[in-house]
Design a protein with these regions (language model features):
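Bacterial N-terminal signal peptides that target proteins for export
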Residues: 1-10
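Intrinsic low-complexity, intrinsically disordered segments enriched in polar/basic residues
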Residues: 2, 16, 283-284
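Intrinsic low-complexity/disordered segments
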Residues: 4, 19-21, 278
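Bacterial N-terminal signal peptides
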Residues: 9-17
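Structured extracytoplasmic
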Residues: 23-164, 172-177, 182-201, 206-211, ...
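Beta-strand elements of repeat-based all-beta scaffolds
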Residues: 206, 217-219
């Protein structure tokens, strides 16, 4: 996944079978959350169309994404504040549908990142000291600090285990709602020759429930200062926002996803109105419209 992974299906009966969060220690809470997240990930075969706004140092995109088990079809509405005409949108999709190498690369990166995320999830209980910092009727907030006796098995784990931060858990479904963290010291590889991530490098992720037992990533914020690339599909500086989730058939093909993302009535581009009114203002870029609460693409 291009960190579009998080097509995680929580099995409702499994979640309900666990005891309440507040009867557990913080370490037990996080172990339970990890078990539920990993189980959901293994059982999730759902596909979704969603609206994505992505910011990287040299690129700003607004696009509809139709995810499948063989990759994701992207309908780019706006690139670097310039709206793409519909014929150009179709051309780019058509090019992707005929580019087997690009499809395989996308799937390879997604599989790599999924494995890495699963490995890091498994480390959460042992890699950190957890303390409860607050709770509501629906969520529990935890703070994490590095466990002094933990020995990270990989380079990625070493970076992960050097972070401190906070995590919010959904009390009923035992899912991660939010997690954020930052490095509290520089992390170097090979004495700095092979890479370095600087203190205060940070990340933040948010998930939202998009169906009765379906959760998806809704925000990704990565700000890593340095030159050690961890995830193949995530930039060292990246901010993604995802919304307007709509389900697709579980067995949808790339070709079918392309039709859905172009023809779905609710997926209208943020371009010009059908008939321009004399003296009217030009349409706002998609990025601005997404920020408006009443925006319906």
């Amino acid at each position: 996944m291009t960190l579009r992974r998080t097509h995680l299906v929580a099995v409702g009966l499994l979640a309900l079978s666990f005891p309440g969060l507040h009867a557990q220690s913080p370490q037990q809470i996080i172990q339970q959350v990890v078990d539920v997240e990993r189980k959901a990930d293994q059982n999730d075969h759902s596909n979704w169309i969603f609206l994505e706004e992505s910011d990287k140092p040299k690129e700003h995109l607004v696009q509809w994404v139709a995810a499948t088990q063989r990759g994701s079809v992207e309908r780019i509405l706006e690139k670097d504040d310039q709206q793409l005409p519909e014929p150009r949108q179709r051309d780019l999709i058509e090019k992707f549908l005929h580019d087997t190498r690009a499809q395989n690369k996308q799937v390879e990166e997604a599989n790599h990142d999924n494995r890495q995320i699963d490995d890091l999830l498994k480390l959460l209980p042992a890699a950190f000291i957890w303390t409860e910092t607050g709770s509501t009727a629906t969520t529990t907030s935890l703070h994490f600090d590095p466990a002094p006796n933990f020995h990270p098995p990989t380079r990625e784990a070493r970076v992960f285990a050097s972070m401190t931060g906070d995590l919010v858990v959904d009390n009923q479904q035992h899912r991660i709602c939010k997690i954020k963290g930052h490095l509290f010291h520089d992390v170097t590889f090979g004495g700095g020759l092979l890479g370095r991530l600087k203190e205060k490098s940070s990340f933040a992720l948010e998930q939202q429930q998009v169906g009765p037992s379906y959760w998806e990533l809704s925000q990704i914020h990565v700000h890593l200062e340095g030159n050690a690339l961890l995830f193949k599909s995530v930039s060292l500086q990246q901010d993604d926002k995802r919304s307007k989730f709509q389900p697709e058939p579980g067995d949808v093909t790339l070709e079918q996803a392309a039709i859905l993302v172009m023809n779905e009535p609710n997926l209208l581009a943020c371009g010009e109105p059908v008939a321009a009114v004399a003296g009217s203002q030009p349409p706002a870029p998609c990025g601005e419209k997404i920020k408006r609460a009443d925006f319906k693409p």
